[in-house]
Amino acid sequence: MVDGTLLLLLSEALALTQTWAGSHSLKYFHTSVSRPGRGEPRFISVGYVDDTQFVRFDNDAASPRMVPRAPWMEQEGSEYWDRETRSARDTAQIFRVNLRTLRGYYNQSEAGSHTLQWMHGCELGPDGRFLRGYEQFAYDGKDYLTLNEDLRSWTAVDTAAQISEQKSNDASEAEHQRAYLEDTCVEWLHKYLEKGKETLLHLEPPKTHVTHHPISDHEATLRCWALGFYPAEITLTWQQDGEGHTQDTELVETRPAGDGTFQKWAAVVVPSGEEQRYTCHVQHEGLPEPVTLRWKPASQPTIPIVGIIAGLVLLGSVVSGAVVAAVIWRKKSSGGKGGSYSKAEWSDSAQGSESHSL
């Protein structure tokens, strides 16, 4: 692992066009849920840099404002929070109208509760330049409208979404969002990475071990654990006699541990007495080399075996972690190729313009 002091010194020297270690992302998740007979829809907006939530807005709060969710954001001035609060409130009002509009598109009654979600963001490549952008809408937990990888056109999932697609095309919304994603979003992501570099650019290797859980006299479950790692991207695989064993592997989603790190496990059912034929392989950018684990009986500690896999080099590679958000709908995106960017005005909202009408 790269020495922490050296990493900080290198970070100080980084300019906007210089190389960051690995890729990084800035994403916003906005969710609105209608509440028939109970007033305005509930609206929540959260922002993430890589795997770290750094801002949040909730219109059910006693005093609804965009607030910091990461220590490195607490020193931002009132101008920033006023601007981001206005942007969130504007988006909440547009969502209120959009929920009513979509209910009409689908011929739904006013009695039911419905959910509208909007995710948008940008990603930097290892060279610190724009790599891809994404924007997606979902209605009642299902994809609705997606900005295509070229950031110039939309994909609608049904006839109702085609109405929104046509309205977006008429208003040149794709062009507006492309400008935000390629310019303003990138500039803010650089700023956040600089402000939170001690947290966002650090590597925390996983603590690994294997546990044994008898099922019957004939079978047992081997569970491979990875705990306390950052960033969230990690690979856990089981092998039998050196060959991949994925068909019967149970793999859980990477989960936040509550302390800024993540945890994950992968399990496989094996015949009793054949446990030593199975190995768990762990890959994470915080590890200098992949780790191979075998289960050891209780009388012996679990001993990690450093596995040197030919052609696999992890040193110096940092992969952007998966965004873990408390939202109903989430979809993985991939997009276009990188390019240069122009400097955006800091007066622009980090969230971009408010959501457009559907």
UniProtKB/Swiss-Prot annotation:
Chain intervals for the UniProt region annotation (Connecting peptide): 296-305
Bilayer topology: Single-pass type I membrane protein
Major subcellular site: membrane
GO CC terms, sorted: cell surface; early endosome membrane; ER to Golgi transport vesicle membrane; external side of plasma membrane; extracellular exosome; extracellular space; Golgi membrane; lumenal side of endoplasmic reticulum membrane
Amino acids binding a peptide antigen 2: 98, 105, 164, 167, 177, 180, 192
List of glycosylated residues: 107
Effect of residue 96 to A: Abolishes the recognition by KLRD1-KLRC1
Transmembrane segments: 306-329
Cytoplasmic compartment residues: 330-358
Subcellular location, record wording: Cell membrane; Golgi apparatus membrane
Effect of residue 93 to A: Impairs the recognition by KLRD1-KLRC1
Region of interest (Alpha-1), residue spans: 22-111
UniProt-reported outcome of changing residue 173 to A: Impairs the recognition by KLRD1-KLRC1
Quaternary context: Forms a heterotrimer with B2M and a self- or a pathogen-derived peptide (peptide-bound HLA-E-B2M). Similarly to MHC class Ia assembly, HLA-E-B2M heterodimer interacts with components of the antigen processing machinery TAPBP and TAP1-TAP2 complex; this interaction is required for peptide loading and translocation to the cell surface. Interacts with CALCR; this interaction is required for appropriate folding. The optimum binding peptide is a nonamer (VL9) that is primarily derived from amino-acid residues 3-11 of the signal sequences of most HLA-A, -B, -C and -G molecules.
Summary of the function given for this chain in its UniProt record: Non-classical major histocompatibility class Ib molecule involved in immune self-nonself discrimination. In complex with B2M/beta-2-microglobulin binds nonamer self-peptides derived from the signal sequence of classical MHC class Ia molecules (VL9 peptides - VMAPRT[V/L][L/V/I/F]L). Peptide-bound HLA-E-B2M heterotrimeric complex primarily functions as a ligand for natural killer (NK) cell inhibitory receptor KLRD1-KLRC1, enabling NK cells to monitor the expression of other MHC class I molecules in healthy cells and to tolerate self.
Protein name (Swiss-Prot/TrEMBL): HLA class I histocompatibility antigen, alpha chain E
Annotated organism of origin: Homo sapiens (Human)
